[in-house]
Amino acid sequence: MFAKATKNFVRETDSGGDLIPVSHLNASDKVQLLGLVTKKKKFWCWQKPKYHFLTVTLSDVLTEDKPIKPVIVESDFAKYMGKFEDFVQGSIETSFGKISLGAGGKGYMENRTSFGNLRKQEIDLQQLMKDIKDRTINLNSRLLQQVIERKHEVLCILREKIITTQKCTITEHVQTEEKISGVMGCSKKIIKVSVSENASMMKDASVILEIPPATAIAYGVIELFIKHSGQFEFCLLDEQQGGFEKESIEGSADPHSGLFRDAAFRYPPDAVDNEMYSGAKNLIPSDASLSVLKQDLSWLKTQFQPFVKLPEDKQRALYKTLCELLLHEEMVTALEDVLDDICTGDKPDLKELNLTQQQDLVDFLELLGCSLQSEFTELEKYQPQDEALLSAAHLLVSAISELSDTLVLLRACCDLQVVPALCCLPNIASADGTVTLSSPLVAALTDRGRFDVVRRLFASSNINLEMTESSLKAVTMKEPRFFPLVLYVALYGFYALGGNVQ
């Protein structure tokens, strides 16, 4: 709940900016100005960097024993009140519920969010740069040696944070449609954040989380570039990249494990995160037919072959488990983090999860043949019996995680058995994106209810889908970035696992 609320806040107030949402309430106390933060480089081109708070500050790793006392500048940030409305019409039934879409009947959903008056605390950079002049970092410290050895992390300092000034509550409501034609209702979680005026609570709330004053909900960092000598500099410009000088001397060693050496969508180890330089903005052209994805999708077929080769019972188990995960966004994120760690040689950490979530995650890893040899929260050893299978699962879960805002629609497409038809579109679409409805490959999409679900899913991934009496037309929207590709990674993954499994 907390992660969803902070993510929405950053998206609404600083989209494309430098703010990073705090993902866990218990991590808020770790958001300390001048504290050290590690940034794990991206694995796939669509992933966002992962950040981890260390227990030390910049002062603690400098060679001299003279502590830095940063000048903190505090100011009003905003009074944040967000209102999200979603008008939906009509309905279509799936195996897990009725989804309101299309024509005939109306629905309305409103989500109000308020963190109240927010304050911004930031370090006076000019003064800080004077304070650290001619000072060096102790590269022999045990902590920094661990960061250097991992090779895929960048050291940062925390330069700013956004904090609440009054108590707030986050309330998770579950809206359920009535049973229709014997089909169970479809639940959708709605996250609401509001400032507490008194002790009263909503009666229909299923989960309530209280946020105390002075809670950090977002923060910003500055990457450090650290030289052999221990001298360091702040990376203040977009084109500057943090890291350790040692990396470049070692020949730009690939930070990723051998599992993924041939992965076409891997993020270049020396690329920076700003989309102007990563090429994400121009990855897929605007107003283009889905046929532009054909080359990448041919590689996907190879990458997902381990799914195809699985015995039918194991295929079905993986497919059903992943379909269930689509209704639990937090578990998708946790699973992606663990697979990232395994595939980069790090030790997974499940301490943020409750025991049930830990068990579910371990059960999923065992489906992949990843045998764990210790307690859930201390996964010291893992023995992947099939590295190619682990690679395929990592690719699919990473794509699903990026589609977090539309996971219910993706689940609906799985249940409506339209995934095979969607996977055919790039291969049979003409140069202008047209596909004739007479093709048996797209017969499942001729139903108006199914089409409306697919249209909304495609729109969320920057694909415009239209249907006439005789044809479908699917083209990318303006500056689609990597989103059409990510959607098709997810679709191909489910298709390879048996898109029609019941």
What is each of the regions a protein language model found here?
Residues 97-99, 189-191:
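Outer-envelope beta-barrel architecture signal
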Residues 215, 222, 228, 236, ...:
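Long, helix-rich, hydrophobic modules that act as membrane-proximal anchors or helical bundle/coiled-coil regulators
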Residues 90-94, 182-186:
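Residues on the lipid-exposed face of transmembrane beta-strands in outer-membrane beta-barrel proteins
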